[in-house]
Amino acid sequence: MSTVTITDLARENVRNLTPYQSARRLGGNGDVWLNANEYPTAVEFQLTQQTLNRYPECQPKAVIENYAQYAGVKPEQVLVSCGADEGIELLIRAFCEPGKDAILYCPPTYGMYSVSAETIGVECRTVPTLENWQLDLQGISDKLDGVKVVYVCSPNNPTGQLINPQDFRTLLELTRGKAIVVADEAYIEFCPQASLAGWLAEYPHLAILRTLSKAFALAGLRCGFTLANEEVINLLMKVIAPYPLSTPVADIAAQALSPQGIVAMRERVAQIIAEREYLIAALKEISCVEQVFDSETNYILARFKASSAVFKSLWDQGIILRDQNKQPSLSGCLRITVGTREESQRVIDALRAEQV
């Protein structure tokens, strides 16, 4: 008599799934955490809502209205979720039939697009970016048949560069009436002039992902947003959980999106950009660094000689970076979150020692 294990009972695609390797899941015992693109210091908030015996609103009014005002869109064009990662999954659940439809994304890029699709049983198609990490529009066009959702991260994680806006327009024309184009703007606060939020009126099939995890310094809150036209938002509302944000999360998010909160966020952005330029300049003078790539974000991608040895050496010293060697076209690359000046100096000193 054959014995069926619990694993045997699981869906085949889940048994075969490689989970997303988040910074926390990868672990480490460091005191300089530069692997998750977080803000380096905590921002303090005081809870003002104490009615924790009641369920929260599905879409907290203050959060939606504050974010709409900040993003320059209508409240009806905003959906708030448990991080932008939930937004990624909601779009697949709303628009893709498992076993029939596909998503498309352009590596090297963020890993959750594929994990979300594979979990649901939706095909993933990839069109690697060009050598300059811009979109291969011909390659995308050739693979669009059957694709319902296209994910484009801009600024792109982990490369740090913006996607050419004209290429975005071409992509939106290629997909009109065929697929949803999702612009992942998790890092847009570091280059706000590049946001596509103003394009929503022109492109009904455009959706934009945002988060409070980066410039707003609230990675531990798990609060993200999807900006889209009302028809898209209404469909997402059909598949979202009934209470995606807890009352404390909604309380803090509303405070972070107040006029004072926006001012504080922009001050943090200015500080991070200044520190980024300092770190880029220093990295370019270190001999174990082969190349430092331009960045529009709060992290820097660099290519190293003997990157695995460098990564381990810094890891052993408590400096935790993000290894990108397994990403397409990123052999020898490590990603470094921009931290405090003290943290930058720890990295610089450790890398200089690698030259000996």
Curated annotation (Swiss-Prot):
Cofactor requirements of the protein: pyridoxal 5'-phosphate
In-chain residues carrying the UniProt-annotated modification N6-(pyridoxal phosphate)lysine: 214
GO-annotated molecular function: histidinol-phosphate transaminase activity; pyridoxal phosphate binding
Enzyme class, broadest EC rank: transferase
Annotated EC: 2.6.1.9
Keywords assigned: Amino-acid biosynthesis, Aminotransferase, Histidine biosynthesis, Pyridoxal phosphate, Transferase
Protein's GO biological process: L-histidine biosynthetic process
InterPro entries assigned to the protein according to its UniProt record, in alphabetical order: Aminotrans_II_pyridoxalP_BS, Aminotransferase_I/II_large, HisP_aminotrans, PyrdxlP-dep_Trfase, PyrdxlP-dep_Trfase_major, PyrdxlP-dep_Trfase_small
Metabolic or biological pathway, per its Swiss-Prot or TrEMBL entry: Amino-acid biosynthesis; L-histidine biosynthesis; L-histidine from 5-phospho-alpha-D-ribose 1-diphosphate: step 7/9
Coiled coil: none
A Pfam family per the record: Aminotran_1_2
Catalytic activity, reaction form: L-histidinol phosphate + 2-oxoglutarate = 3-(imidazol-4-yl)-2-oxopropyl phosphate + L-glutamate
HAMAP family per the UniProt record, alphabetical: HisC_aminotrans_2
Family assignment from sequence similarity: Belongs to the class-II pyridoxal-phosphate-dependent aminotransferase family. Histidinol-phosphate aminotransferase subfamily.
Xref: PANTHER family: HISTIDINOL-PHOSPHATE AMINOTRANSFERASE, HISTIDINOL-PHOSPHATE AMINOTRANSFERASE-RELATED
SUBUNIT field: Homodimer.
Name recorded for this polypeptide: Histidinol-phosphate aminotransferase
Name of the coding gene: hisC
